[in-house]
Amino acid sequence: MDLSRINTWKSKQLKSFLSSKDAFKADVHGHSALYYAIADNNVRLVCTLLNAGALKNLLENEFPLHQAATLEDTKIVKILLFSGLDDSQFDDKGNTALYYAVDSGNMQTVKLFVKKNWRLMFYGKTGWKTSFYHAVMLNDVSIVSYFLSEIPSTFDLAILLSCIHITIKNGHVDMMILLLDYMTSTNTNNSLLFIPDIKLAIDNKDIEMLQALFKYDINIYSANLENVLLDDAEIAKMIIEKHVEYKSDSYTKDLDIVKNNKLDEIISKNKELRLMYVNCVKKN
């Protein structure tokens, strides 16, 4: 039996098929009638199959809500949700339906799921399987921006730092700016932002990323800076400029980490670094 052309069947042929014992069995390609109806975005056929009992006879390897989430049109997703399918269900790959909406860039479908349950963006069998992390990996700034706008409270810092790590690693500056804007807006510790992966941007000599990072009050003292200051003049200048800014700013100059660090000692021992420091002080 081949159901791949079921969307072209006449009503009489379809009615005969639905009354047969094979109505909900897999065809020669391993798919059900519902699979082909969704693949063709055939809303009428989907409704007919649902009324005939398709959801009570799903194949083990088919996840209709996940499949429908890849469609640009949201009608079938709405119908399946109304029919009682669980939006938090994992498929055989450990993903939710929202994950596939993100993967396809379907913003309207993404909004449909998130409005129903914003926590879905953090559902996944592992942290790497969540829809939020997937959107970051895809560098989809629009979807991540929407996700952040729908979170009613702050979320796990470890998740945020993991996302910042992969963003810096991949050189996605706009995504990093979006995440740091959120991190800054929710920072209530009155301290410099701790970004462990600043060293990664330095090692990659990603000047554009570093320039973006240094627009924020980040902790530049968390990395071992001695070798960097001595090996790369351009990056050394950026670090020293930020250090001088912190020492001059009324908000940051009294922070312990600004007053007590090894940076001044490293600078004092090197003529070129001292000159950079003096020039930065004059400009500040």
From Swiss-Prot:
Listed Gene3D superfamilies: Ankyrin repeat-containing domain
Family note: Belongs to the orthopoxvirus OPG039 family.
Highest taxon of the lineage: Viruses
Lineage per the UniProt record: Viruses, Varidnaviria, Bamfordvirae, Nucleocytoviricota, Pokkesviricetes
The keyword Repeat is annotated on this UniProt entry: yes
Positions annotated as ANK repeat: 29-58, 60-89, 93-122, 127-157, 159-188, 193-222
GO biological process annotation, one example: symbiont-mediated suppression of host innate immune response
Keywords linked to the UniProt accession: ANK repeat, Early protein, Host cytoplasm, Host nucleus, Host-virus interaction, Inhibition of host innate immune response by virus, Inhibition of host NF-kappa-B by virus, Repeat, Viral immunoevasion
InterPro entries in the cross-refs: Ankyrin_rpt (IPR002110), Ankyrin_rpt-contain_sf (IPR036770)
Residues in coiled coil: none
Function of the molecule: Inhibits antiviral activity induced by type I interferons. Does not block signal transduction of IFN, but is important to counter the host antiviral state induced by a pre-treatment with IFN. Plays a role in the inhibition of host NF-kappa-B activation by preventing the acetylation of the RELA/p65 subunit of NF-kappaB.
A Pfam family matched in the record: Ank_2
This protein's GO CC annotations: host cell cytoplasm; host cell nucleus
Keyword Repeat belongs to the record: yes
SUPFAM superfamilies: Ankyrin repeat
Protein name: Interferon antagonist OPG040
Compartments in which it is found: Host cytoplasm; Host nucleus
Induction remark: Expressed in the early phase of the viral replicative cycle.
Principal subcellular localization: host cell
